[in-house]
């Protein structure tokens, strides 16, 4: 009733969007408002007819408070012009709710088509198809991904995301509510929820599986070697080159370098990642495998030329990484 009108007028004065025009929800979670559709006059008449005692909060008489000013000065005068004001605002609430349902339906369809999960567990939106959509739909897809469809964003958060989706350049990122971040990559938008920083380094042992937080690292001795078995996350190396050395898998750091397989000279890890067009999210989580502090594998990209298999190799070691999120999370 009047509470709904007051709320809607306040929101309209603040420049609310379509979703804000839904006003107060009659039912939200465990909260139920059974008197929402009754006007102030109807409630006052019911109280008087049934001789119900009530307490009047004197702060409700203070017109310096915005809601009180609307209640005492705006609504009574407006009702002189339109006695059915309560019904009219009720219809606006219903229309806004129907429009929101339409948007949410479209968001579900778009998300199913355009949102994928990359090999690192990031949510990936295909940029070429995403950029042609209306900005309101794009913003709601982001809301859907981070699970904030029922929460209101503050104005600066809303405007910040809108500006980012329209104007951002490759490599730029934006912090979002609930510890999420969005990154504009070359061909995609990537979204990731920042977790607690996992341990930076892990000691590994031959013929063992090591839990490295977001992934497992495995080492096993094998009897032979085939190039066809190698993948992005699995390599076979000359195990004899690193026998009795201290093995460690850790995050890469500035200054790291190695001799990539097939090359003769050292190359900085940072340069290799740039040349490979690796996005910033992936760079932050890039690990290397070292033997006595020398990099022998830029995990997921290239082994060191030092540990390549040759005709003289006697001991074959298969090293691999299994991303936990590939098995545990789906969009």
Where would I find each of the regions flagged by the language model?
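Catalytic subdomain that performs nucleotidyl-dependent activation
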Residues: 2-92, 96, 111-112, 119-130
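AMP-forming adenylation/ATP pyrophosphatase catalytic core
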Residues: 26-28, 90-331
